[in-house]
């Protein structure tokens, strides 16, 4: 009996064991199904609400301590109190930002004006990020600082009341957790929300701990979820007691967070509790750096079929579209030059006149909600029509709408996601040199480049929703001289030329820096021919 046995013999000899295995498996599925339901009151939902209530009180208490520190006028103690506030906020962030987005804006909004272009209404900066900038101002306005702190504290004290009459389900809780993983990877570890305090690693640890506590309730004792526990634990270990400047973000992403995101997505799908309220994200993708993580068809414009893409490629290179038969789209957006012309500013229709701005790459341009440097076009189709009709550019005699749609389909397809960085993230160890790995960590960390050039497209598409294209006021110079008498700001007003709001003066769209080695010179006016001064 204890000798070599075939599979059929084992089945025959152990009917009782088969029954036990079946019952255990059934009970395990029953337990998980009781924890997760598409709707209704479940242990997962109750735990999330209880956690929110408890941590909201903790956050409110930290806001009160922040207020006392600010009133005392000790800047260093106030900064430390703000770090404590920010960390405690991370305990409620996933739930608050998901269920109460408008209420959340008072706490952690970017310290800039936000405008609704239709009616040109705008919201003034407010919240912890603005408080941070004030605490690092050499000459802060104490009255304004105290007003900001008081506004945050007053709102925080009322947080538990938000739960009144809230109806949530497990699908929503799990989606809020999914979004929080993206927030950790794309915002927290880069320093986007606290660039001066540099508390992003500590904040990430709190956010991940909150995620793990909620996750454990859903996993229970299910052994099939051991991989999730493994990657979550590894992510926590990598974050623990690490400084912001020295943190290895590539290892954190590649070895822990991206696999965790993948396994978490599988878990949600396998248990039939998928909910996707995102405008752009593809939850069927493996992870944030998968080529299909963002869906081009979810951005402005139409769907791109193969036939349309092929026709669009032909038209893109066809000089007959121009009024004089001398220029094509490829004249300024040459595929061999990263879909640019590598000139400071492009040459116009007549072959002599210089245009006003640099020709940006068309690679990954599908992943934007605004086209042109000033964002005056809301789709690739609108951009293409504008260029074809412009007397300084293509000066076309007539334009067929079918041609516009075809060219847009081709341009929309230009997102290869096959750079050495992409291959390294996909665990091709030899794809990046040691120097490049160091550079990527600096880019996403100490240098804070990724606070404007957000992962995974490395452009101004803002995480975690990826539903807004960001514009920045950098004070771009007219040349590459950054000091002395040759230092002059660019006269180009950027987005202000479209929307006459003072905070749009000098604002330009943040372009992708993918394949940037092929696309010099840089900035809207091509003022920088090399990376070093930039």
Residue ranges: model-predicted function:
Residues 4-7, 13, 20, 24-27:
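Short, low-complexity, charge-dense intrinsically disordered segments
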Residues 283-386, 424-533:
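Short glycine/threonine-rich turn/loop motifs
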Residues 22-41, 234-308, 368, 373, ...:
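Post-cleavage N-terminal segment of exported redox proteins
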Residues 1-3, 492:
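Short regulatory "switch" loops immediately downstream of catalytic or recognition motifs
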Residues 39-291:
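Mature extracytoplasmic or organellar-lumen-exposed domains after removal of signal/transit peptides
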Residues 53, 57, 72, 76, ...:
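Soluble non-cytosolic domains of exported or imported proteins
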């Amino acid at each position: 009996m204890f000798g070599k046995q075939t599979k059929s013999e084992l089945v025959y000899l152990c009917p009782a064991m088969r029954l036990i295995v079946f019952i255990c498996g059934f009970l395990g599925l029953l337990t998980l199904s009781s924890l997760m339901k598409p709707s209704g009151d479940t242990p997962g939902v109750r735990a999330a609400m209880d956690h929110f209530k408890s941590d909201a009180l903790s956050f409110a208490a930290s806001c009160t301590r922040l207020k006392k520190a600010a009133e005392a006028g000790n800047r260093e103690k106030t900064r430390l109190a703000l770090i404590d506030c920010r960390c405690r906020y991370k305990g409620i962030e996933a739930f608050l930002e998901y269920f109460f987005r408008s209420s959340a804006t008072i706490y952690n909004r970017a310290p800039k004006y936000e405008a609704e272009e239709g009616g040109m209404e705008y919201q003034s900066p407010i919240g912890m990020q603005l408080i941070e900038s004030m605490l690092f101002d050499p000459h802060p306005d104490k009255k304004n600082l105290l007003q900001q702190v008081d506004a945050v504290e007053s709102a925080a004290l009322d947080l538990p009341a938000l739960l009144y009459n809230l109806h949530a389900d497990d699908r929503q809780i799990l989606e809020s957790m999914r979004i929080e993983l993206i927030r950790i990877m794309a915002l927290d570890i880069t320093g986007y929300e606290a660039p001066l305090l540099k508390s992003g690693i500590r904040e990430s640890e709190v956010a991940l701990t909150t995620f793990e506590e909620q996750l454990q309730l859903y996993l229970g004792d299910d052994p099939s979820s051991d991989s999730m526990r493994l990657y979550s634990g590894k992510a926590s270990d990598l974050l623990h007691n690490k400084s912001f400047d020295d943190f290895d973000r590539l290892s954190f992403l590649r070895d822990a967070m991206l696999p965790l995101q993948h396994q978490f997505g599988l878990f949600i799908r396998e248990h039939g509790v998928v909910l996707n309220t995102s405008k752009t994200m593809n939850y069927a993708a493996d992870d944030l750096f998968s080529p299909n993580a963002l869906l081009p068809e979810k951005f402005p414009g139409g769907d791109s079929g193969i036939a349309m893409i092929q026709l669009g490629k032909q038209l893109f290179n066809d000089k007959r579209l121009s009024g004089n038969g001398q220029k094509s789209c490829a004249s300024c957006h040459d595929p061999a030059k990263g879909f640019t012309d590598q000139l400071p500013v492009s040459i116009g229709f007549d072959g002599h006149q210089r245009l006003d701005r640099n020709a940006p790459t068309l690679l990954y341009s599908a992943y934007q909600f605004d086209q042109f440097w000033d964002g005056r076009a809301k789709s690739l189709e609108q951009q293409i029509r504008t260029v074809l009709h412009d007397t300084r550019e293509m000066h076309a005699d007539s334009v067929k709408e079918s041609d516009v749609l075809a060219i847009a389909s081709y341009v929309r397809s230009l997102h290869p996601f096959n750079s050495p960085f992409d291959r390294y993230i996909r665990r091709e160890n030899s794809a990046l040199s040691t120097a490049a790995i160091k550079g990527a960590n600096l880019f996403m960390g100490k240098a804070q480049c990724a606070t404007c050039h957000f992962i995974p497209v490395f452009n101004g598409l803002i995480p975690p929703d990826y539903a807004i294209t960001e514009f920045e006021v950098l004070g771009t110079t007219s040349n590459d001289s950054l000091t002395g008498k040759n230092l002059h700001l660019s006269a180009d007003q950027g987005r202000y030329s479209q929307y006459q709001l003072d905070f749009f003066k000098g604002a330009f769209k943040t372009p992708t820096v993918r394949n940037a080695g092929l696309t010099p010179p840089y900035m809207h006016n091509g003022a920088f021919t090399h990376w070093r001064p930039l």
